[in-house]
Amino acid sequence: MSYRKLGRTSSQRKALLRDLVTDLIINERIETTEARAKELRSVVEKMITLGKRGDLHARRQAAAFVRKEVANTETGQDAIQKLFSDIAPRYQDRQGGYTRIMKLGPRRGDGAPMVIIELV
């Protein structure tokens, strides 16, 4: 099994990916480092596939990973509801490839390659 360690322990890495997945679902576009974005891509694709399945078990699997944050303050919609009601129906006819990674250039402080990852 191949994955990036991202300079963190196992639990820290899982927490980072949970936060990034939740942010990407809520904002649909985030700026991060290239290594994080490439690792995030596979997790987000799996979450959207769960959303497309749409049954109770898929909803519970996604809820176990995605943080319980409010996505829309006016409607009170959280990240899971947005994933299943807004994002998943958008990709019903698409088999994978739900994200796009666009390179930005190096970060000013340490020169890390920065990218924008967004939902297509």
From Swiss-Prot:
Domain of life: Bacteria
InterPro entries: Ribosomal_bL17 (IPR000456), Ribosomal_bL17_CS (IPR047859), Ribosomal_bL17_sf (IPR036373)
Keywords annotated in UniProt: Ribonucleoprotein, Ribosomal protein
Gene3D superfamilies: Ribosomal protein L17
Keyword Mitochondrion among UniProt keywords: no
GO biological process: one example: translation
Any one GO molecular function term: structural constituent of ribosome
GO CC annotation: cytosolic large ribosomal subunit
Family as reported in the entry's similarity comment: Belongs to the bacterial ribosomal protein bL17 family.
NCBIfam families xref list: L17 (TIGR00059)
Quaternary structure annotation from Swiss-Prot or TrEMBL: Part of the 50S ribosomal subunit. Contacts protein L32.
The protein's name in its UniProt record: Large ribosomal subunit protein bL17
The organism of origin for this protein: Anoxybacillus flavithermus (strain DSM 21510 / WK1)
